[in-house]
Amino acid sequence: MIQMQSLLKVADNTGARTVMCIKVLGGSKRRFAGIGDVIKVAVKDAAPRGRIKKGEVYNAVIVRTAKGIRRSDGSLVKFDTNAAVILNNKLEPIGTRIFGPVTRELRTAKFMKIVSLAPEVI
């Protein structure tokens, strides 16, 4: 469960290391975001020679949360950290590699590119 001011790790090779959620997209009163939701993020920590610089604002999709996601069969999938993949304005991933596992819930028409790049789909 991600809200404003939440810090997330970046699960791609864009050069950003840590981002902070500055807005949960999808309604004026929406407070929380989960796996598969798009948020606005500000880059807090970046690699020296990366594509993305500190202070820039991007869209991102959440791929892992410590809160987890409940499946229809009753199982609960949780992760150790909160992680996101940075997107451009067309909601396509900027990076060319994804690090760590992602969940099956991303397997929609919008995020099939992320699922295909991921090393493991849980």
From Swiss-Prot:
It comes from Nitrosomonas eutropha (strain DSM 101675 / C91 / Nm57). Binds to 23S rRNA. Forms part of two intersubunit bridges in the 70S ribosome. PROSITE patterns: RIBOSOMAL_L14. The gene is rplN. The lineage of its organism: Bacteria, Pseudomonadati, Pseudomonadota, Betaproteobacteria, Nitrosomonadales. Part of the 50S ribosomal subunit. Forms a cluster with proteins L3 and L19. In the 70S ribosome, L14 and L19 interact and together make contacts with the 16S rRNA in bridges B5 and B8. Keywords: Ribonucleoprotein, Ribosomal protein, RNA-binding, rRNA-binding. GO terms for biological process: translation. This is Large ribosomal subunit protein uL14. GO terms for cellular component: cytosolic large ribosomal subunit. One of its GO terms (molecular function) is structural constituent of ribosome.
